[in-house]
């Protein structure tokens, strides 16, 4: 708002270091992303995604933390639309990248786990199922981003009662 901008212009900040240091976020997350050196086929990208999922699980285990939600974003390469056949067969949404080139819209999805975990097997299975569900097998992959949401330490997760569904 204008009042904050005017105060800032005059060198007065209403937010002090005390407020900044006392801030505690409501939730935490870890994110890992890769821009691939060249366009990957879905088969090759699948291997990279599995490695990223296993790495995320090992990071959680190392930090004694758990997650119950995974978010995967797959960015496609402009080469996916470079030849005439690809442009005519692709029926999805097309966006423009930072360089003004046409590129297929990224794929994005979320997988919710039944309970908080740091199990490499459970996380990998969920991420691979999500990958298979959201990715277009006819396009070339250029960017991959995996985020673990709702990250808490193991002790906090053990103390938090799980919700029960009554039918």
List the model feature ranges, each with a label.
Residues 1-167:
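Basic, low-complexity intrinsically disordered segments
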């Amino acid at each position: 708002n204008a009042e904050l901008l005017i105060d800032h212009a005059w060198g007065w900040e209403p937010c002090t270091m005390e407020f900044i240091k006392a801030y505690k976020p409501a939730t935490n997350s870890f994110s890992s992303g890769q821009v691939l050196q060249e366009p990957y086929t879905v088969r090759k990208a699948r291997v990279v995604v599995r490695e990223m999922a296993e790495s995320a699980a090992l990071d959680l285990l190392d930090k004694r933390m758990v997650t119950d939600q995974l978010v995967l974003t797959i960015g496609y390469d402009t080469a996916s639309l470079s030849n005439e056949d690809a442009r005519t067969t692709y029926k999805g949404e097309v966006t423009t990248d930072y360089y003004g080139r046409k590129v297929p819209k990224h794929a994005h999805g979320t997988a919710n786990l039944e309970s908080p975990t740091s199990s490499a097997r459970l996380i990998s299975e969920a991420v691979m199922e999500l990958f298979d569900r959201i990715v277009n097998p006819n396009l070339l992959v250029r960017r991959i981003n995996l985020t673990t949401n709702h990250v808490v330490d193991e002790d906090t997760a053990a103390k938090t009662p799980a919700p029960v569904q009554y039918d």
